[in-house]
From Swiss-Prot:
Organism of this sequence: Streptococcus pneumoniae (strain Hungary19A-6)
InterPro entries: DNA-dir_RNA_pol_bsu_ext_1_sf (IPR042107), DNA-dir_RNA_pol_bsu_external_1 (IPR019462), DNA-dir_RNA_pol_su2 (IPR015712), DNA-dir_RNAP_su2_dom (IPR007120), DNA-dir_RNAP_su2_hyb_sf (IPR037033), RNA_pol_bsu_bac (IPR010243), RNA_pol_bsu_CS (IPR007121), RNA_pol_bsu_protrusion (IPR007644)
Function: DNA-dependent RNA polymerase catalyzes the transcription of DNA into RNA using the four ribonucleoside triphosphates as substrates.
Enzyme class, first EC level, given as a word: transferase
Alphabetical list of NCBIfam families matching this protein: PRK00405.1, rpoB
EC identifiers of the protein: 2.7.7.6
Record protein name field: DNA-directed RNA polymerase subunit beta
Length: 1203
């Protein structure tokens, strides 16, 4: 027997064909969401407050300080928030301290700071009753970047940019004359020496002393001449910079100084963030820049005077490691003192080394490091600017290297916590000005923190972020895998990211640093390809937001691959050579071969085993979760694998799903971490279990109650249904499955079914990827799914009185009311079809002048005789089913409703959808197709033992698509079915062809794994042997029921008066330009005329035609299409005098063209206007009558008084 048995959870054993020992379990798959939000609550929010506060008033007599904050209990539970369309959020209270510096008085107060949405355990947020996910964003990291460009003469020039988290950019560039310029905040360029002089190093000799003598420096100094002898060089430089930044304003050195300080050295205006400081120190540090260079002068320990490194030594990694403590300390440190007129007058500390130029052994080049400013320094420093200039000048000498902006060392991830923190920080800094003003204006004696803080903008910003940010998305809840994938999604779009139109080919492409960090397969097809990615299965974020992936460390001395796990970011990995996970190892853990396949800086080739530093932990660390669920992925073309991974996310949960016979072993982990199953939180023993709840008694005696969800509507309209897996008496451990979620079976992901599939054509019905299916799959509910739709009706107060929910609906027979209760609401369990009333509702009509008799009737019978319109909620087209639930919300019950709404009724209708012709099916290898015919079981081809085949696929769909994995799955699946086992064949480490054939042989199948099939209609065998087996097939969310649509009479667009388009708007089919050409080609003038008039936008014409048809009269001539009038109006709005002339060149008023029409044909809007007018008249008459009554009454009173 090939393979070995592996236990997945407590309910499933699979025979696994993997050969590689897994040394590291998969991390929790949704930790990217949960860890980030936890960090935000633990310290992120505190840091945001500390960044903005304390705030002082303009006279510095008052100060507002931040003390701390507390998050209280949420107002609603999770379930209540879902039901009431509320947000699952908790109130946050912040403690502030207000200090009066004149009197020394301190007021401390707790201020309510709004409700903050709280993340659920599943990594989602409930916002207004809907489950949402904040997608992590992939952005360019702050730091310093160097690039090269070739001009039209083939000359290489370099550029450099310092990009902060927020603040002004600082750029360097050289031109064709070898002069170096700098740009501040994208303005006009100035020689870089001007900026150096402004920093306080004004003399030419000082500049040569700092940077050394090079052609670029010399040319720039010559260009940068002293123009005004009245000013010092520093003042002149400052004025020149000011002129670039604020052209047209009077320039002084002082104003320039304060402007530069604000632009670069003020922490409130310029922020590198921790990650920016880390990246700058890493790039400008001398350690990385000295690597493999020849030192030109001896390195001497400044304390002892001993020579650490002789001149002429090549600085290899081992040499640098030996003096690392000195390089991090004071070795070759030089302090430069800027002159008094400089922007920043503090001493500038640099590290300065001289090395031999790589291009010319006789030249010496100066390398300047920024001497590693402290991590807490979040602004750029003069040392950073000088070190950046030095790196830039070194590039021309062949030292250093340019950056690749698509490298994952230069792109980082902003997860939920950081995105939220940025939003809050933005609003707090806006609030700061407001607070300052209030502190200055109001009376200091009575001022309290509560009075000066306005929380409205902050709460509004948080609300807006969750409600309408591009990164806050409605959760994709088709099935648990799609939920999981959505939580692990990384998007390069969104605020501060890229836009679809600007993103080029390079950004979207797979980069070598994606290995183990981002999946090279799973990305959408279409305009977002490569911009939206998925985290790889082992990917993990470090504190700076860079993606790390785990490797096994190789002991260089002994050559043993240890089980020590090291997590590396992309730029750390560049320094090492990494062997693949499938490299063979000896018993003692050393490499079995002298040469192994490995990677170094993106080069995949064979490397000697003795230079390997690390080894992959698992073959599946390259791919994402959905991709890791595709068996035999290694045998599929990547384009088809992409479709396979994406289509698994569109699978519809079935009534009784089956886990695949041929899995990858990933199904258990994906189901466990998806959040759709019920997982035990503690060890214990089951004391009660039914379909609604499970009770588990812990060892300490406390009781855990787990509620099981039954047929809840998911975001995608599928049934979210959980099934209890445990029974009374079972012992459960923490992390065990208590109940399966939707699309799960025995604790494993089960997106589809295991039908018997044959690759053969049948009467041409599987032409072009179509799928032929046996009726058994319909009758036995194999591919039946339940769909729930939600409909709501609300009653509002109108001008003419309140709307009412009632059984008494005008002009409706008793038959239509048979399933409504006494309130007029449908009963649960009623079967409804389109057009049936779900909620009976009437709206008051405008009442005309009432006669005395009518007023009498009103007085006797109350509202019965009042004029009302029927505005009931009815079942829309194609939505028939069974009423699953009804929810009623009223103000009386304390439900929060929108203003003006008195009552809200929600009706849930469940539909049981069997598979039918037109539904889309797919395998896991990108082999998708539409069901073209459902054949009776007796007509389907059958196997020699009499088993009929379930599905027939076209064999021509395989060779050109190159997804051979489906054929391997087919054969192995048949063997698994025959042997009665489940199989795991992990990606890149699955069953080899030897394993496959030995399993086929073990199952007693023929050696070619094919079989003879018999025609079900004739009983004759088919000519050739056919590949028949078991393939995992899923039903996708693209169902024909949702797409079928027809219109006869329906709504029209307001402006053009043409019929709307699309099923959602109940629109028509567009008869476009090309279709009109077709009619013109046939000369079908009458058809053409009615297509362009009655059936489109001739308003009067279509009303007349409708009337003529109903009354049996001849159809009148059409009028002028509305779109023609729209065109005329548009031309007139552009100032063109557009008129219509008749045969006698007399101007025709456009509305004259429609004269001769019957006056009784009225535009819909006219009807509304007439109604409104009638209502207003009725109201006016009523008011007049009331006034008359009042005057009469007054007159009577007066008369009485006089008597």
């Amino acid at each position: 027997m090939a393979g070995h048995d592996v236990q997945y959870g407590k309910h499933r054993t699979r025979r696994s064909f993997s050969r590689i020992k897994e040394v590291l379990d998969l991390p929790n798959l949704i930790e990217i969401q949960t860890d980030s939000f936890k960090a935000f609550l633990d310290h992120g929010l505190k840091e945001v407050f500390e960044d903005v506060l304390p705030i002082s008033n303009f006279t510095d007599t008052m100060e507002l300080e931040f003390v701390g904050y507390e998050i209280k209990e949420p107002k609603y539970t999770l379930e209540e928030a879902r039901i009431h369309d509320a947000s699952y959020s908790a109130p946050i209270f912040v403690t502030f301290r207000l200090i009066n510096k004149e009197t020394g008085e301190i007021k401390t107060q707790e201020v309510f700071f709004g409700d903050f949405p709280i993340m659920t355990e599943m990594g989602t947020f409930i916002i207004n009753g809907g489950e949402r996910i904040i997608v992590s964003q992939l952005v360019r990291s702050p730091g310093v970047y160097f690039n090269d460009k070739v001009d039209k003469n083939g000359k290489v020039g370099y550029g450099s940019t310092v990009i902060p988290n927020r603040g002004a950019w600082l750029e360097l560039e050289s031109d064709s004359k070898d002069i170096t310029y700098t740009r501040i905040d994208r303005t006009r360029k100035i020689p870089f020496t001007t900026l150096v002089r402004a920093l306080g190093f004004s003399g030419d000799d000082e500049i040569f002393d700092i940077f050394g003598d090079s052609e670029l420096v010399r040319n720039t100094v010559e260009k940068d001449i002293h123009k005004n002898p009245m000013d010092s060089r520093t003042d002149e430089a400052l004025k020149e910079i000011y002129e670039r930044l604020r052209p047209g304003e009077p320039k002084t050195a002082e104003s320039s100084r304060s402007l530069l300080v604000a632009r670069f050295f003020d922490p409130r205006r310029y922020d590198l963030a921790a990650v920016g400081r880390y990246k700058i120190n890493k790039k400008l540090n001398v350690k990385t820049r000295l690597l493999n260079q020849t030192i030109a002068e001896p390195l001497v320990d400044p304390e002892t005077g001993e020579i650490l490194v002789e001149a002429g030594t090549i600085m290899t990694r081992s040499v640098i490691e030996s003096i690392e403590s000195h390089l991090d300390g004071d070795l070759n440190k030089i302090v430069y003192i800027p002159n008094d007129a400089a922007v920043v007058t503090e001493p500038v500390v640099l590290q300065k080394f001289k090395v031999v130029a790589p291009t010319d052994p006789d030249r010496v080049v100066t390398i300047i490091g920024n001497a590693n400013p402290d991590d807490k320094v979040r602004t750029v420093t003069p040392a950073d600017i000088l070190a950046e200039m030095s790196y830039f000048l070194n590039l021309a000498e062949g030292l250093g290297r340019v950056d690749d902006i698509d490298h994952l060392g230069n792109r980082r991830i902003r997860a939920v916590g950081e995105l939220l923190a940025n939003q809050v920080r933005l609003e707090l800094s806006r609030m700061e000005r407001n607070v300052r003003e209030r502190m200055s204006v109001q009376d200091n004696e009575v001022l309290t923190p509560q009075q000066i803080i306005n929380i409205r903008p902050v709460t509004a910003a948080v609300k807006e972020f969750f409600g309408s940010s591009q990164l806050s998305q409605f959760m994709d809840q088709h099935n648990p895998l799609s939920e999981l994938s959505h939580k692990r999604r990384l998007s390069a779009l969104g605020p501060g990211g890229l836009t679809r139109d600007r993103a080029g080919y390079e950004v979207r492409d797979v980069h070598y640093t994606h290995y183990g960090r981002m999946c090279p397969i799973e990305t959408p097809e279409g305009p977002n390809i490569g911009l939206i990615n998925n985290l790889s299965s082992y990917g993990h974020l470090n504190k700076y937001g860079f993606v790390q992936t785990p490797y096994r460390k190789v002991d260089r001395e002994t050559g043993v691959v240890t089980n020590e796990i090291v997590w590396l970011t992309a730029d750390e990995e560049d320094e090492y050579t990494v062997a693949q996970a499938n490299s063979r190892l000896n018993e003692d853990g050393t490499f079995a071969e002298k040469i192994v396949m490995g990677r170094h800086q993106g080069v995949n080739q064979e490397y000697p085993a003795n230079i390997v530093d690390y080894m992959d932990v698992s073959p599946k660390q390259v791919v994402a979760v959905a991709t890791a669920c595709i068996p035999f992925l290694e045998n599929d073309d990547s384009n088809r694998a992409l479709m396979g991974a994406n289509m698994q996310r569109q699978a519809v949960p079935l009534i009784n799903p089956q886990a695949p016979y041929v899995g990858t072993g990933m199904e258990y982990q994906a189901a466990h971490d998806s959040g759709a199953a019920v997982i035990a939180q503690y060890d214990g023993k089951v004391t009660y279990a039914d379909a609604d709840k499970v009770e588990v008694r812990r060892e300490d005696g406390s009781l855990d109650v787990y509620h099981i969800q039954k047929f809840r509507r998911s975001n995608s309209g599928t049934a979210y249904n959980q099934r209890t897996l445990v029974k009374v008496g079972d012992v459960v451990e923490k992390g065990d499955f208590i109940a399966d979620g939707p699309s799960m079976e025995n604790g494993e992901m089960a997106l589809g079914q295991n039908p018997i599939v044959a690759y053969m054509t049948w009467e041409g019905y599987n032409f072009e990827d179509a799928v032929i299916m046996s009726e058994r799959l319909v009758k036995d509910d194999v591919y039946t799914s339940v769909h729930l739709e939600e409909y709501e009706s609300e009653t509002r107060d109108t001008k003419l009185g309140p709307e009412e929910i009632t059984r008494e609906i005008p002009n409706v027979g008793e038959d239509a009311l048979k399933d409504l209760d006494e309130m007029g609401i449908i009963r649960i369990g009623a079967e409804v079809k389109e057009g049936d009333i779900l909620v009976g509702k009437v709206t008051p009509k405008g009442e005309k002048d009432l006669s005395a008799e009518e007023r009498l009737l009103h007085a006797i019978f109350g509202d019965k005789s009042r004029e009302v319109r029927d505005t009931s909620l009815r079942v829309p087209h194609g939505a028939d089913g069974v009423v699953r639930d009804v929810k009623i919300f009223t103000r009386v019950n304390g439900d929060e409703l929108q203003s003006g709404v008195n009552m809200l009724v929600r009706v849930y209708i469940a539909q049981k959808r069997k598979i039918k012709v037109g539904d889309k099916m797919a395998g896991r290898h990108g082999n998708k197709g539409v069901v073209s015919r459902i054949v009776p079981v007796e007509d389907m081809p059958y196997l020699p033992d009499g088993t009929p085949v379930d599905i027939m696929l076209n064999p021509l769909g395989v060779p050109s698509r190159m997804n051979i994995g489906q054929v391997m799955e087919l054969h192995l699946g048949m063997a698994a079915r025959t042997l009665g086992i489940h199989i795991a064949t992990p990606v890149f480490d699955g069953a080899s062809s030897e394993d496959l054939w030995s399993t086929v042989k073990e199952a007693g199948m023929d050696s070619d794994a094919k079989t003879i099939l018999y025609d079900g209609r004739t009983g004759e065998p088919f000519d050739n042997r056919v590949s028949v087996g078991v393939m995992y097939m899923i039903k996708l969310h693209h169902m024909v029921d949702d797409k079928l649509h027809a219109r006869s009479v329906g709504p029209y667009s307001t402006v053009t008066q043409q019929p709307l388009g699309g099923k959602a708007q109940f629109g028509g089919q567009r008869f476009g330009e090309m279709e009109v050409w077709a009619l013109e080609a046939y000369g079908a003038s009458n058809v053409l005329q009615e297509i362009l008039t009655y059936k489109s936008d001739d308003i009067n014409g279509r009303l007349k035609a409708y009337e003529a048809i109903t009354k049996g009269k001849p159809i009148p001539k059409p009028g002028v299409p509305e779109s023609f009038r729209v065109l005329v109006k548009e031309l007139q709005s552009l100032g063109l005098d557009m008129r219509v002339l008749d045969e006698d060149d007399q101007e025709v008023e456009l509305r004259d063209l429609d004269e001769g029409m019957d006056e009784d044909v009225i535009h819909v809007d006219d009807l509304e206007k007439a109604r409104e007018k009638a209502a207003q008249e009725a109201k006016a008459a009523f008011e007049a009558e009331e006034a008359e009554k009042a005057t009469k009454a007054e007159a009577t009173e007066e008369a009485a008084e006089q008597e």
